[in-house]
From Swiss-Prot:
EC number from the UniProt entry: 4.2.1.-, 4.2.1.55, 4.2.1.119
Pfam families to which the protein is assigned, alphabetical: MaoC_dehydratas
One GO term (biological process): fatty acid biosynthetic process
Keyword terms of this UniProt record: Fatty acid metabolism, Lipid metabolism, Lyase
One MF annotation (Gene Ontology) recorded for this entry: 3-hydroxyacyl-CoA dehydratase activity
Name assigned to this protein: 3-hydroxyacyl-thioester dehydratase Z
Keyword presence, Kinase: no
Site entry (Important for catalytic activity), positions: D40, H45
């Protein structure tokens, strides 16, 4: 876990790798809960029997579920001290190059693209994150997340 002592410390790290998460196993139960939360019950996600004969040979996590893992995975990599709160401001360049089969393990690696001073003690950080599937040549998700830190 990398600790930035302040938003100035964070800004000084622009262009650097900030960390890599632990491996996380994707379970069918988590996929089903995500399907319930989003209303996306497509068979490739929630019907293991049908999915076994489908294009991936098993059920797969939703792309948006993989994206939704970013906060969980990024919180393992770094923290910023001296801030009152961190606000998810949005995303850039989100792609899902490869599926995430249920039962597989994923982890993320993040780099700090840049930090912009917005004034009044607020900075906006752009973090590039790649989520990889263990044993896969292609990443499951590549995204830039934008976080505002209020000091």
């Amino acid at each position: 876990m990398r600790t930035f002592e302040s938003v100035a410390d964070l800004a000084a790290a622009a262009g650097e790798k900030v960390g890599q998460s632990d491996w996380v196993t994707i379970t069918q139960e988590e996929v089903n809960l995500f399907a319930d939360a989003t209303g996306d019950h497509q068979w490739i996600h929630v019907d293991p029997e049908r999915a076994a004969a489908g294009p991936f040979g098993t059920t797969i996590a939703h792309g948006f579920m993989t994206l939704a893992l970013l906060p969980r995975l990024q919180h393992q990599m770094y923290t910023v001290k001296g801030v009152k709160l961190a606000i998810n401001y949005g995303l850039n360049k989100v792609r899902f190059p490869a599926p995430v089969p249920v039962g597989s393990r994923v982890r993320a690696t993040s780099s700090l693209v840049g930090v912009e001073d917005l004034g009044n003690g607020t900075v906006q950080a752009t973090v590039s994150t790649t989520v990889e599937v263990e044993g896969s040549a292609k990443p499951a998700c590549v995204a830039e997340s934008i976080v505002r830190y209020v000091a």
